[in-house]
Regions:
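Conserved acetyl-CoA-binding loop-helix of GNAT-fold acetyltransferases
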Residues: 98, 104-117
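Active-site/acyl-donor-binding loops of N-acyltransferases
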Residues: 146-160
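Conserved active-site tyrosine of GNAT-family acetyltransferases
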Residues: 142-144
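Conserved N-terminal entry element of GNAT/NAT acetyltransferase domains
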Residues: 1-24
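Acetyl-CoA-dependent GNAT
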Residues: 16, 20-27, 31-94
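Conserved beta-strand-loop-alpha-helix junction that forms the acyl-donor binding cleft
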Residues: 128-139, 157-160
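Residue-level recognition of the GNAT/N-acetyltransferase active site
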Residues: 94, 99, 132
Length: 160
C-alpha cells in the first residue's frame, strides 16, 4: 500500500456521523462536559447542565454513541470592531470537545467543517471563538493551520 492509500484508509476509519443533537443525547453531552472539566485543560471551565444548552445550535459526532460536540449561538454585533461590522450576524462557537480516546483522528475538524457548511446555508458570513485552553500552541495550530481561522486578539496574564 502506498502512503496516500494508507492515509485515505485511516481517514475512512474515523469518519463519524455528524448531525444535530437530539434531546435523548443531551445527557451524554453533559457527561462529556463533566469529563472535560475533570481534565482541567482550560482555565475556569465549568461543566454544562442541560439548562446551559438551551437555545444553542449543537452538532454532535457519533461512533455508536456521542463522542464529540460543538455548539454555540448566533449573535448580532452591537458595535463596529476591526473585523466585525456593526449589526453583522455571526456565529459564536462556545465549545468544541472530543472524547480523549477519539482525539487526533480528524473528528474536531469534521465538526468544524460541518458547522461551517450549516452556517453558510443560513447566510452567515463569520464564525468566531475564544479559547481558554492551557495548551494554546496545539489549539492555535488546529484553528489557524488546519481550520483556516484568522488570529484576531489575545489576552495574556502573569500572576505576581
Amino acid at each position: 500500500m502506498n502512503y496516500h492509500i494508507i492515509k485515505l484508509y485511516e481517514r475512512l476509519l474515523y469518519m463519524v456521523i455528524i448531525k444535530e443533537i437530539n434531546q435523548f443525547d443531551m445527557h451524554r453531552l453533559v457527561e462529556l462536559s463533566l469529563m472535560w472539566e475533570k481534565e482541567d485543560s482550560c482555565y475556569g471551565y465549568r461543566a454544562n447542565t442541560e439548562d446551559d444548552l438551551r437555545d444553542r445550535y449543537i452538532l454532535a459526532a457519533y461512533d455508536d454513541e456521542l463522542i464529540a460536540y460543538i455548539f454555540g449561538k448566533e449573535e448580532i454585533q452591537e458595535k463596529q470592531t476591526s473585523v466585525i461590522d456593526k449589526n453583522m450576524h455571526y456565529f459564536e462557537i462556545e465549545e468544541l470537545y472530543v472524547h480523549p480516546s477519539y482525539r487526533s483522528r480528524g473528528i474536531g475538524k469534521q465538526l468544524m467543517e460541518s458547522l461551517e457548511k450549516e452556517l453558510k446555508k443560513k447566510g452567515l458570513e463569520m464564525m468566531m471563538l475564544n479559547t481558554a485552553t492551557k495548551n494554546w500552541k496545539a489549539i492555535m495550530h488546529f484553528y489557524i493551520d488546519e481550520i483556516g481561522m484568522n488570529f484576531w486578539s489575545a489576552k495574556l496574564y502573569k500572576r505576581l
